[in-house]
Amino acid sequence: MNSNRTSSSHNSRNLKILNASFDVPRPPGGGNSPLPSQGRSVRELEEQMSALRKENFNLKLRIYFLEEGQPGARADSSTESLSKQLIDAKIEIATLRKTVDVKMELLKDAARAISHHEELQRKADIDSQAIIDELQEQIHAYQMAESGGQPVENIAKTRKMLRLESEVQRLEEELVNIEARNVAARNELEFMLAERLESLTACEGKIQELAIKNSELVERLEKETASAESSNEAIDSLKVELEACRKENQDLVTSIRTLKHDMKRQVRSMKEAANTMDVQRQSILLLEATIKRKEKSCGSMQKNVLNYEALIAKLNAELETMRQQNVYFRELSENLQQKEVRQLDRGVAIVQPMRMTADAGRFVWQSGTIVAQEPLPLERQSAAATSNVSVSAVRLSSGPPPDQTYPVNGHDRAKYGLLQLFAAKLDWISAVPLALGHLALKIILLAMRLHSCLQNVHIPLRANRDLGAQLADKICELQEAQEKLKERERIHEQACRTIQKLMQKLSSQEKEIKKLNQENEQSANKENDCAKTVISPSSSGRSMSDNEASSQEMSTNLRVRYELKINEQEEKIKQLQTEVKKKTANLQNLVNKELWEKNREVERLTKLLANQQKTLPQISEESAGEADLQQSFTEAEYMRALERNKLLQRKVDVLFQRLADDQQNSAVIGQLRLELQQARTEVETADKWRLECVDVCSVLTNRLEELAGFLNSLLKHKDVLGVLAADRRNAMRKAVDRSLDLSKSLNMTLNITATSLADQSLAQLCNLSEILYTEGDASHKTFNSHEELHAATSMAPTVENLKAENKALKKELEKRRSSEGQRKERRSLPLPSQQFDNQSESEAWSEPDRKVSLARIGLDETSNSLAAPEQAISESESEGRTCATRQDRNRNSERIAQLEEQIAQKDERMLNVQCQMVELDNRYKQEQLRCLDITQQLEQLRAINEALTADLHAIGSHEEERMVELQRQLELKNQQIDQLKLAHSTLTADSQITEMELQALQQQMQEIEQLHADSVETLQSQLQKLKLDAVQQLEEHERLHREALERDWVALTTYQEQAQQLLELQRSLDYHQENEKELKQTLVENELATRALKKQLDESTLQASKAVMERTKAYNDKLQLEKRSEELRLQLEALKEEHQKLLQKRSNSSDVSQSGYTSEEVAVPMGPPSGQATTCKQAAAAVLGQRVNTSSPDLGIESDAGRISSVEVSNAQRAMLKTVEMKTEGSASPKAKSEESTSPDSKSNVATGAATVHDCAKVDLENAELRRKLIRTKRAFEDTYEKLRMANKAKAQVEKDIKNQILKTHNVLRNVRSNMENEL
């Protein structure tokens, strides 16, 4: 096996080029053109046969060892063993194709040997014809020599006659010897031909056996290739399953990675939340410290308020003293009113008098001036303050800025007033709540009272004003601190909620991780159990099947691959963990840096606060510290910190997204999907284009078939082809048949490609076959197979047409045979002729070939001066009738030969049609039809033999030699019949063998279909299992996702990812379905390939049948040659009879001359006297000598035959010549009757000597005419032979051109088909 692999490894590259084509090339000229190469001997053929048998035995041994070695290979079904088996199968295919090529070369050599034998037979026939022509020329020469003698004296004549008779006898003996030799040579040639034919038949039988064996080997190879393809398909399906498993593993790994990333993100978010909580705790602690400080300050302020209330109580006691001073205040108010009128333009505060009791003690801003009224009691003042808080809050905002200073000392105090100065110090205080407003108003009233008291006591009010401003500031800071505390509490609550959610999410993810680990452990346990179960049958000693062994190997391979993939994924996970650690470290560093910077800022602020506390007095220390803390934790800075945290979170999210994009190449997947869609669209467009091309090709082939049918119908009409010759008609018929076959083969190829044509018509093309054919279309019928459709559409009309043509030809033959007897009788009757005296005797003597010229021109003969008036009626009539019968027989034989050729052509067409019907699996019916055709041919041959025997009996040739020849012919015919019977038996045996082969092929196809169905069922079951597993997995994932969604809203992202996985799984299922469709398409293509191989086998059988047809053609040619030899023999016998008659007449004339009786009455009707007769004889002898010496005595007339180029014109000329001769004979007979009627008494007075003289002259003239006729016929035969040869050459050239054109078109179609297949 290894040696065969190494020897034929170079042939594996050319497997696509090697095609098992069984086309046997015929010679270019048909049966007439011999090949230059010589045939092989029987010994060489036997040696080749022995070598082929050895090769066949070696191939069988190789197949047997391959079949024995298959179970082990199946047990070891690995990829390497399968590849080795594929290589071995390819090598065997190459070797088998080589053997097929060698056997095709043997078939070609056999065809060449047949053509060589035909050439040898043709050469032998030509040599025999040349010998016969030489003998005829010698006879003519002797006859001319006899006719050239001068009858001066009877003694000289007798001597010459004796000498001539001796020479004639000698020549006859030579002729007999030559004929015997020729017969012996022919017998030897026939014996050699019979041996060669037997050897050829044996070789053909062996070749057929080898072809059958080769077909069996090809079938075995197809089976092996089918098994290899099935194994490849199984491997592909397993690869697809592996890829699906890999994808599932990848999906699981990606899901695990995503879960790990989510865990890491959650851990990071927890860390960040913890950091934020720490920061918030620190801020809360700071705020609590500030609140404590402010509570202390509030306590101190309350103490101060209590002190102020005590003072107010003291002052209430002193109110009585103050009432006494009201007079003074009134006077002062009057003065102020007067001054107000004066100082309106200066914007000085004017104290108006009290208008109403309700308005007492209220103060408002009015266009930059303070209007003050008399004070009220505390209760009423507080009510007034509550009712006018909003007005004060709005109006105070439009007052002067707090930086404005108001002098208090001296005249300024009296100028502006106390309330105006106090309000100028409080105008910058912002809006405060109601409680604080009440408090502030109370304080202001107290301050006013204090101011009034202190004015009376003359104490400065600067310190009190500073305390009020500090009090207002503290209140505002308290409000702001409360608001900030509320916001921080809200943020703290949100952070606690997020931390709780994260903790819940972490717990759920930990549970999921535990579940996944448990599932992985369960799957690992299952795999271990499967491995144990796989190991158990091998350990128990049970023989595993191929499927179990393959599943075991697949499980081990899958486990190894899964382990490798898991290791790789763990390494990747470790790498990713290291990267995540690095990135978390970087993030921690960044966060630490930012925290460190913030701590630095806090330290700086604390230092500034410490410095300010040192500089400020004790009263302002607490407020300054609180203000610094408040500045360090303002809302703007808090928002900035939050924004920074958000930015950091965004950066972390971006980094995680980048990592996820690096792992899941979603963009690449999208691009690949787009490319897939583009490729699918391109494939769809290519399929559409291919279907359109197939439609166009099918329509064109249909139109070609219609045109061929149209031409075929035209060929049936006699009006169209009545002018053409038979050979051209046959050539046209063959061309039309070949075009029909080509269109049918194209239709078969298009039907095999399984393309259904919706519309088989184009707008530019019309249906031409409807002109002469009115049969209905069968295109709308439904058929069970392509072969039945092809048979119903194409083969049935051709078979019917051929049968009708055969019946018409048979009817014409019967009519011709029935009308032949009538024609013979009509031609044997004398025809009336008109005698014209247009020529003189000198013209008649100077133009001895005038009859020939007139016959060729088409005129009747008018010069009858050479005919004797007293010619014998009985002899002329008998000779004319014999000539007429011979001519009629020749005509009939030629016509029968033509008809037989036509029948043979039609039979060839029938055989071709039957060979085409082999494609329809009806070989048994074909063999029956061929048997019927053979029986019909036998009946025709028997009828022809009976007609020939009847003709021979009518002629009266009862000689022994003819009987022997007829018996020999009968024996040959019987042998042919036996051979045909043997051929029939062999054909029936072949048909039975083919039926057995068809049954075996059908069984094999059924087995293959069963295997395919089993494989499809297994694949469907596997797919269902995978679908069920996928559905279960999906359900589990959905359940988990639902639980996760119920636990936490963050699990929606994982649910979306699982939905994407679901889509990917559905796409993978679609991909598997597309793979199933592709596998089905490959199955259909394999079936088409098997059909193509069957078609090639059928073509090989067709070529074998063509070889049989060529053999039958050779037999027909042989029969024609035998007929021709028989005709020549008949001519020789007729010449011998005429020569014997001449000898008898001469002997009679010699007897009369010896008696010495003469008469003067005899010489008168001959024309001139004896001297003139001698001159006339000399002139005739000179003319005859010139005729013998020159090739054409009448150049002007002989050249006419050379000008005519068609075979039909020569036939017409021969027919006209024969009719003219009959007319001349008829013209001679009435002359004789008239002479008999005019001179009845002259016969009794004629002397014997004169009669002999006249008889000799007539015999000489008849001999001369016969020689001329023989020469003319010989030349006519030569001309016709040359024309036939040229026509055959032209026909062969036309056939060669047509073949080349068909081959070119076939190659073009093959290239187109290969290009279309490559594009598809």
From Swiss-Prot:
Biological role stated in the UniProt entry: Core component of the centrosome throughout spermatogenesis. May participate in mitotic spindle assembly and the mechanics of morphogenesis through an interaction with microtubules, either directly or indirectly. Is a target of several homeotic genes.
Transmembrane segments: none
Record's GO cellular component terms: centriole; centrosome; ciliary basal body; Golgi apparatus; motile cilium; pericentriolar material; perinuclear region of cytoplasm; spindle pole
Protein name (record): Centrosomin
Coiled-coil residues: 97-516, 626-654, 712-983
One GO-annotated biological process of the protein: photoreceptor cell morphogenesis
InterPro entries referenced in this protein's UniProt entry, alphabetically: Cnn_1N (IPR012943), MT-associated_AKAP9-binding (IPR052593)
Residue numbers of Phosphoserine PTMs: 545, 785, 874, 876, 878, 1191, 1234, 1237, 1239
Extent of motif Nuclear localization signal: 644-656
One Pfam match: Cnn_1N
Subunit structure as annotated in this protein's UniProt entry: Monomer.
Tissue: Developing visceral mesoderm of the midgut, the central and peripheral nervous system, and developing gonads. Isoform J: Expressed in ovaries, testis and embryos. Isoform A: Expressed in testis only.
PTM annotation (Phosphothreonine): residues: 782
Region of interest: Disordered: 20-41, 517-554, 810-849, 863-893, 1220-1249
